[in-house]
Amino acid sequence: MNDIFSALYAPLSKAQTEEYLLRIGYSGVHHATKEVLAELMQCHFMSVPFENLDVYYAHKEPDLSTASLYDKIVKNRRGGYCFELNGLFLHLLRAFGFSCTARQARIIKGEFLSPPSHEVIVVKIDGKSLFCDVGFGGPVPPSPVEIICDSVQESDGRRYMFSDGGE
């Protein structure tokens, strides 16, 4: 059981981090700032596609271990879905020194309240919680957005609102 958790949460090595940065085309500084986070997100969006082919066509359980995600996204230059893309991006952010956690989220369309089925990243910078999502196959904020519950936020001309999950 301990080996499963070790594989899922294994950090990226320095070499893996550098290869990941080459994959997304990032050559900037390695600082844990909001500006660097925004640039990393932008590079990731431009280089790694959302894809869910394995979920529907591979007929196998997804392997969300760091090594498997690294091989698929960096080595094999594929994309992935939220648990894969945000999962590996979380490790990249931690390698940069960001304080961040993966969180479950739900996508609300109209009045329908679906169960939480999406993974996002919450990054803490200067006492603020920032929303980060590089793994959604639809419109998302292209840069970090401060999480302020029940307040409409704008990013790149689109409006977003965060809720604590209450009805």
Question: Which residues make up each language-model segment?
Answer:
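His-Asp-centered catalytic microenvironments across diverse enzyme cores
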Residues: 2-19, 23-24, 28, 49-50, ...
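Secondary-structure boundary elements
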Residues: 8-77
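Short amphipathic alpha-helical patches
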Residues: 63-64, 93, 116-117
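Cysteine-centered nucleophilic/redox motifs
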Residues: 78-103, 121
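Residue-level marker of positions within ordered structural domains that often coincide
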Residues: 45, 87, 126
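Short active-site-adjacent helix-start/loop capping segments
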Residues: 58-61, 91, 110-112
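General N-terminal targeting signals
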Residues: 54-57, 67, 86, 117, ...
